Amino acid sequence: MLDIKKIKEILPHRYPFLLVDRVISVEEGKKVTAIKNVTANEEFFNGHFPEYPVMPGVLIVEALAQTSGIAMMQSEANKGKIGLFAGIDGCRFKRQVVPGDQLLLEAEITRMRGAIAKAKVKATVEGDLVCEAEIMFALSDLPK
């Protein structure tokens, strides 16, 4: 389990773009399960949509990408690197995410060859599928 302090040591993202609140399980270099608590105070709800707040799908995908990043950075070989979003396949949204929902984010690294990595990801709320996709990353060295 990783708290927000540990997550910030792994991911370069910060408020308002850090979309992982807690990691509840880690299978080193392979799989991560994390949580994003969606509150009524999220800035994106001011415009999406004021009278009908729905979490934008692209931010659900970003939360899944960040969860994948945590999985990739658990590998010692990837310390000091950053995963840059390189592509997405088969992305489907099945349910809206609204204030009060808790997103369960799952990412499993399926391929890691050189600087390219792929992950199967899915987000659920209370067991209901919200989103699933396959995400591709290009690993790059962080600037010194």
From Swiss-Prot:
Active site (UniProt): 48
This protein's name: 3-hydroxyacyl-[acyl-carrier-protein] dehydratase FabZ
Compartments where found: Cytoplasm
Biological process annotations from GO: fatty acid biosynthetic process; lipid A biosynthetic process
The keyword Lyase belongs to this UniProt entry's keyword annotation: yes
Domain of life: Bacteria
InterPro entries: FabA_FabZ (IPR013114), FabZ (IPR010084), HotDog_dom_sf (IPR029069)
GO molecular function: (3R)-hydroxyacyl-[acyl-carrier-protein] dehydratase activity
EC number: 4.2.1.59
A cellular component term, taken from the record's GO annotations: membrane
Gene label: fabZ
Protein role: Involved in unsaturated fatty acids biosynthesis. Catalyzes the dehydration of short chain beta-hydroxyacyl-ACPs and long chain saturated and unsaturated beta-hydroxyacyl-ACPs.
Keywords from the named record: Cytoplasm, Lipid A biosynthesis, Lipid biosynthesis, Lipid metabolism, Lyase
Family to which this protein belongs: Belongs to the thioester dehydratase family. FabZ subfamily.
The reaction(s) this protein catalyses: a (3R)-hydroxyacyl-[ACP] = a (2E)-enoyl-[ACP] + H2O
Source organism of the structure: Listeria monocytogenes serovar 1/2a (strain ATCC BAA-679 / EGD-e)
